[in-house]
Regions:
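Short loop/turn segments at strand-loop or loop-helix junctions that form parts
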Residues: 2-4, 35-40, 82-86, 114-118, ...
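Donor nucleotide-activated moiety binding/catalytic core segment of transferases
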Residues: 66-72, 210, 214-263
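Leloir-type glycosyltransferase catalytic cores
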Residues: 34, 123-170, 276-328
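Well-ordered, non-membrane alpha-helical segments in soluble/globular domains
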Residues: 12-19, 45-54, 92-99, 189-200
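Short, well-ordered secondary-structure micro-motifs within conserved domains or adaptor modules
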Residues: 68-102, 246-250
Length: 328
């Protein structure tokens, strides 16, 4: 203003520059910085990092690369963290992953963990990269936050996956194993549990028991009457098509495959992504629950993303908008 009778002391100034500067500071304050923590070095991990970084940058946020424990001090400038896989005893990066979890818990910072997806995850074909990878805050499987409660049907429809009706017949009980040193096996002696649960199944039903071994698992149940699955180390769909009455499992994603293919599941483990549509007591083996799976499937589709969705920023925005709502 040039001043005047009401504001004679005011000098002329450029409000455009002032408001532009204020706008830039406001924009700067809303930019989020994500610590990209390099915890795994497989081909799928490299693609996960590459595409997630593209997505963060695509929406105008920043990244800081963190390759080891010594560089973790850089996390102090970050609003959130991203890593591939959770800590487990068999990983050479186990200590790094454990320290990342401790840091996130102490600082109360979001820690996004990418892991194997649940539908169309292609985990039995490592060369096929057209796959879905799960993304959760604070962990993996059902111990992570996905901000997916009461999700709409859009992502499930996008998968174009036909969920099979519940099966009402079947000859075999399939017990699905997993890697005893994996992170989702650390809260239980899974080897002892397999023996115990197979013995209980033997007492409750005359149906023969098949045991599906994890490809990386060497030790097998030593008690109970069972036969090895004829499809060990092959796509689990072949097992599920082998006249299966019910699947019994802990936290393996094979339980999700069973549910999607219409085979009832019994799991006592709330780590399992199948838990909400499964039975939890082995005494249900002769009459396993077959609940409505519709909303469960919709919610499941919001737990996982394809590589192009990571690269576009769609996956990152889903979490960003829940962690820091736009109105804030």
């Amino acid at each position: 203003t040039n001043g005047g009778p009401w504001f004679p002391a005011y000098e002329k100034c450029d409000y455009h520059e002032i408001w532009t500067a204020c706008g830039e500071r406001l924009k700067e304050s809303k930019i989020k910085t994500v610590g990209i923590c390099y915890t795994k070095n497989s081909i799928h991990s490299k693609l996960s990092y590459e595409n997630f970084v593209k997505g963060v940058l695509a929406v105008g946020d920043r990244i800081v690369k963190i390759h080891n424990i010594e560089e973790m001090k850089l996390l102090d400038q970050c609003h959130a963290m991203f890593q591939v896989s959770e800590a487990n005893m068999s990983s050479p990066d186990n200590e790094f992953r454990q320290k990342l979890k401790l840091y996130a818990d102490e600082k109360k910072k979001p820690r996004l963990v990418i892991d194997t997806g649940f539908v169309k995850n292609k985990r039995f074909n490592h060369e096929d990269l057209d796959r879905y990878m799960a993304l959760g805050d604070g962990g993996i499987k059902r111990k992570a936050r996905y901000f997916n409660e009461h999700s709409p049907s859009d992502r499930w429809k996008k998968l174009k996956f036909e969920m099979k009706p519940w099966r009402t017949t079947g000859k075999h009980i399939l017990v699905i194993g997993q890697n005893e040193v994996g992170i989702s096996s650390q809260h239980i002696n899974v080897l002892d549990w397999w023996s115990k649960i197979i013995q209980e199944i033997n007492e409750l039903t005359n149906r023969p028991v098949l045991f599906r071994k994890h490809p990386s698992q060497r030790r097998l149940p030593i008690y109970g009457i069972y036969k090895p699955s004829p499809f060990n180390n092959k796509d689990i769909i072949q097992d599920l098509q082998n006249d299966i009455w019910c699947v019994v499992a802990r936290t393996t994603n094979g339980a999700v495959d069973a549910i999607l293919n219409g085979i009832p599941v019994i799991t006592p483990d709330d780590w399992s992504m199948a838990y909400d549509v499964a039975g939890h007591d082995i005494k249900q083996i002769n009459n396993p629950p077959t609940p409505d799976r519709t909303q469960w499937a919709y919610d499941l589709a919001y737990c996982q993303w394809a590589f192009p969705e990571y690269a576009s920023g769609e996956a990152w925005l889903h979490y960003r908008n829940h962690l820091w709502p736009p109105e804030n």
